Amino acid sequence: MSLQKCQEEWGELEKEFQQLQETHKVYKQKLEELSSLQNLCSSYINKHKRRLTELKGNLHGYKHTSNLEEKELIQQIDGTIKERHNAFFDMEAYLPKKNSLYLNLVLGNVNVTLLSKQTKFAYKDEYEKFKLYLTIILLLGAITCRFVLHYRVTDEVFNFLLVWYFCTLTIRESILISNGSRIKGWWVSHHYVSTFLSGVMLTWPDGLMYQMFRNQFLAFSIFQSCVQFLQYYYQSGCLYRLRALGERNHLHLTVEGFQSWMWRGLTFLLPVLFFGHFWQLYNAMTLFGLSRHEECKEWQVFVLALTFLLLFLGNFLTTLKVVHTKFQKNKLKKP
């Protein structure tokens, strides 16, 4: 390339750089405008929420003294207030907010709000794929430890993988909740309890008690991975249909249990889920029995027994509540 051409190239680059500087200046201005709008929206929402709470309290005071027409008006306003709170939830999904205590401990005070619907859905989709791939890896790991590699070292690798998997799930779920995902209740707590359980399993030293429970735990892990794979396969298809019909949010997640939206098309999974819940109870009873063994000296045995019992109670009662609520609704619909 001649010197003249190099000079021409440099001239073009200078023009492009100046244009880039102008574009970047506009970009920074828009960011400042966006930040101001976000603060303004958050302020309006908080103010509106406070006023709605006060209004709801005042209306509640009139319920017992109002006539029939006034009661209907109060009920109508109550229903609108609930709808308004749902609208606020959707709005806040696109606004920066304070992280939960857990996210603050893990990530610090970092803004995890994803601003576009496409970015949110891409993150949710990546979360679902992560669950699927790790479920398959954990299934293969449990089968290998149960039938091929009978070593404590390989068991520790498997248990460490479980700890990492559940820790990562809790972080990703917390980010999704901050971005408008409606996963809540026991199915959030479930992964924290599972993280603790896997951590205790990892610290359990090799010995007679460990070997007496090892095969049962690995068999349970194989079963659990198979159930999770089935749930992902059928729940993702069901959610796709419900989202297409507008009956579910685009950030709705697959879960390890049973929820009301699964009633149509996924009830065949209920017996499998209940079997898994009672297997957790069986694990708890086995460990309680081992804790009374004369050679049992490890604290992990009793702690694991309590943790499995907690998982059973949480899973079983939550699933039972969903089934009971659905039956009650079906009874009310019947003439």
UniProtKB/Swiss-Prot annotation:
It is a multi-pass membrane protein. One of its GO terms (cellular component) is nuclear inner membrane. InterPro entries: TMEM120A/B. Residues 1-39 form a coiled coil. It comes from the Eukaryota. It is found in: Nucleus inner membrane. The chain crosses the membrane at residues 100-116, 130-150, 157-177, 193-213, 268-288, 300-320. Belongs to the TMEM120 family. This is Transmembrane protein 120B-B. It comes from Xenopus laevis (African clawed frog).
